[in-house]
């Protein structure tokens, strides 16, 4: 059910996100995701967790390369061994710091994934670091607690703005070359919930 929701939710969010009248689109399927995730978790368990960073890299590759904006596809060129190195160092330091370094580990992985993502000839850059992430997470947590949950919506919006603010594009994008794909135009009038539930129209 979680995998159905993750695929459906991404397809739905992408189909409802647009810029200059052109939509994003996620082309992944439930079947592909089930195979990838099931294999990844099984091998991670059998390897006592050492396969997990390789799975993360392969999942990022799948998730990114199945996403498009208009008629141009995003791409990912990360290296599994580099992800493993970041993960192993992060796990060791997380243990030594009683869990505090976990924010740096997550930030380092996220930054690596974004820095190895491209859209056409433009590359995405990330300035997300552990210290910033820890600070924003504490602010969100404290604000929600102090407002007894009432301020959760504000905190989430602040957190989203913070995260998106760490991303930028480096390179030229020819906006004239970006066009609505035929698949998007054909399905633009369909029910959005069909995307959420992974149902083909």
Please state what every model-predicted region is.
Residues 1-201:
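Membrane-interfacial and juxtamembrane segments of integral membrane proteins
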């Amino acid at each position: 059910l979680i995998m159905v929701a993750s695929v459906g939710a991404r397809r739905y969010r992408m189909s409802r996100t647009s810029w200059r009248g052109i939509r994003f689109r996620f082309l992944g399927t439930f079947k592909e995701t089930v195979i990838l995730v099931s294999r990844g978790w099984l091998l991670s368990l059998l390897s006592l967790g050492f396969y997990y960073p390789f799975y993360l890299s392969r999942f990022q590759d799948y998730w990114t390369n199945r996403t498009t904006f208009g008629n141009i596809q995003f791409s990912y060129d990360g290296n599994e061994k580099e992800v493993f190195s970041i993960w192993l160092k992060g796990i060791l330091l997380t243990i030594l710091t009683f869990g505090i370094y976990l924010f740096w580990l997550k930030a380092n992985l996220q930054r690596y994934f974004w820095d190895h993502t491209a859209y056409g000839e433009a590359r995405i850059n990330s300035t997300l670091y552990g210290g910033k992430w820890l600070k924003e997470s504490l602010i969100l947590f404290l604000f929600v607690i102090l407002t007894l949950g009432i301020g959760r919506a504000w905190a989430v919006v602040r957190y989203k703005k913070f995260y998106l603010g760490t991303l930028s594009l480096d390179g030229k994008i020819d906006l004239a070359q970006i066009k609505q794909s035929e698949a998007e135009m054909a399905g633009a009038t369909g029910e959005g919930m069909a995307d959420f539930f992974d149902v083909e129209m």
